Amino acid sequence: KTSLDPYNGITILSEDLPKDILEFEQNLKDLIQNVKDNKNLIWIYIDIKKSDFIPIATKFGFTFHSCNSDYILLVKVLKENAIVPNLANHTLGVGAVVINSKNEILLIKEIIRNEYYKLPGGHIDDAEMISQALSREVFEETGVVVDFERIISIGHFYPHQFHKSNLYVLCL
């Protein structure tokens, strides 16, 4: 079972893969032969429980695209000019400017790197809104409950963790 994508590719979900590795290999070989002339890409999500399928896919020219804790997404480029969109090329962080009624600004010291003061904030989790991350990070680091008002600045830093860029969103 496959689905079409905006890049003239087809996507195969892990739950639609056969249980048997030999059947997977034959199905993949047949699929490539059947679509190589009219599709640009083939995407395959492989669940961690089927990780023994990965070497089979790479043998057929699939490369690693992205992953999560329980799956990997592989892609095979069938046409030279095919567009393969990048994924996860930034980490995201949020910082909070918290000013009280006395016009005092809230600063913290990190537990590990505590040689300087900084604004409370941190990593924006996967599928988390900026406003949620802001409130969560300030509360986790200070115990103070805040409400997101607005974004006041965005910073871009490279290199950062994992050889990626970082977007730092500063909020009130």
Question: How would you label these PLM feature ranges?
Answer:
Residues 44-52, 124:
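Conserved beta-strand-loop-alpha-helix junction that forms the acyl-donor binding cleft
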Residues 78-119, 146, 150-153:
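N-terminal strand-loop-strand
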